[in-house]
């Protein structure tokens, strides 16, 4: 009995642990990416190398482990995979990196917290989320969505005084990038468009998994298509600049390898697995943890300055985000209860006879929601 309880507890905690570990990995990617972007690495080339590494890592696992579960590739599934490779690896990541160039790693990560709100709206439009305004859990999700949008606007438009942290004292303002309002607005717009693209990716991934329920294979395909499509974009954007493709045994290679393995290969796979049970909104609901880690590390490594207005905006975003999480948690419990009720409501028929071919009567027992009724039926 004790073992069963432990197993159930671990089963319930697994999605939460997976998402927390994933956010720690994403925070490391943000720090490394900001470092190589500051050194002049092309974000378009970084995206290509990142997904090339992810494809090489995931392809053998997908080929071996998905042999029995991989469905037949159809034209519609391939179209969806091609679109998935465009939405997240190409559009979202390039816009996110560009937004980070104009601002800071902390700002870009904090702005990314509007992702669950955008995902929630799109999930509602595509019928993956239910909203009943008279129900408190739905109200919480709607209010939380509005709060995240308001917090993003505060972060973008309100700067406020500099917060003097003991490890950033004496750092001059010119050492911090992206502190003016124009850079903030430009970066916020780019990151927000990237968030919308990523939200579309999450919704389409959830839909694709219904007809192609092989997570490893889907991840490998997305990374491959992201590499091909990203290469086409990079060749156009870096035309006449072959030096942009140069890479050696340095932080560029480390960033591409780390991002490819942890933040593309593992992130797509883990996100797909958790999404099948918890939905796309749950998967995107842990981004504030990444923001906190990046904010602390950025002030130490890059000497980024913290502004009161942006901290307040981030707090509002987090508050709204956890309202969405609270509503999703209530949804999950409610749906689980309904499923149990439906299972217990199904009638069970038990036929008992005297063991002979020709019987005088049979007793049919109908059990429904704990109630038993016995009816004697005489047969000819």
Swiss-Prot record:
Its main location: membrane. It is a multi-pass membrane protein. GO terms for cellular component: membrane. It is found in: Membrane. The chain crosses the membrane at residues 16-36, 45-65, 71-91, 107-127, 142-162, 187-207, 216-236, 254-274, 282-302, 306-326. InterPro entries: EamA_dom, WAT1-related. Pfam families: EamA (PF00892). Belongs to the drug/metabolite transporter (DMT) superfamily. Plant drug/metabolite exporter (P-DME) (TC 2.A.7.4) family. This is WAT1-related protein At2g37460.
